[in-house]
Amino acid sequence: MGGMKIITTLLLLLATVAVGDKKDLPVATVHVFLKEDCPIARYHTKTLSELHEHYAKEGIAFRGYVSNRKATEQSVAAFKAKFVIPFAIEPDASLSKANLLGAKVTPEVVVRDRDGKTLYRGRIDNTYADFGKRRRVTTSHDLRDVLEALTKGEAVEPKSTEAIGCLIPVT
């Protein structure tokens, strides 16, 4: 198990280094954890697509992971097509990405800078007060606010929020 975590860490680092000079790297990468059958994750796909569309121009990259032991290339491709997800998304059937980045539920995001430092971890927004309890009005747009701060060169606050969603199985 420890070997798999080391390999995954090395692959993430190699993917970062392989791009070349740091100025060529994205300002930050939003790692998005999703599940095909999670209603809260499904709900947030539109918001994530809109954020990607807006912030990709600002140098923010998005990577999606379907953290589900049953996830396959085919199931992820079908999910991506059904919900029109514009960024790369891959199966995380081994849960190695979720374990490496500390994701516990879907949807959950982890924003890392070009050096791999975690800047933010948590919910996309506060649409859901609890599992199955959707607010009438979303009052906190956490991920959008983090990305806005990053593009303006401001400090990211808060550093984390509690994500509400479907549990990622513990390994």
What annotation goes with each model-predicted range?
Residues L11-G20:
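Hydrophobic h-region of N-terminal signal peptides that target proteins for export
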Residues R42-K82, P91-L100:
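Structural microenvironment flanking redox-active thiols in thiol-disulfide oxidoreductases
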Residues G3-L11:
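Sec-dependent signal peptide recognition
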Residues R114, T118-T171:
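Thiol-/selenol-based redox modules, centered on thioredoxin-like
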Residues L25-P39, F62, L147:
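Short active-site neighborhood of thiol/selenol oxidoreductases, capturing the structured segment around
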Residues K35-K46, R69-K70, V109, C166-P169:
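Short, thiol/selenol-centered motifs that function as redox-active sites or metal-ligating centers
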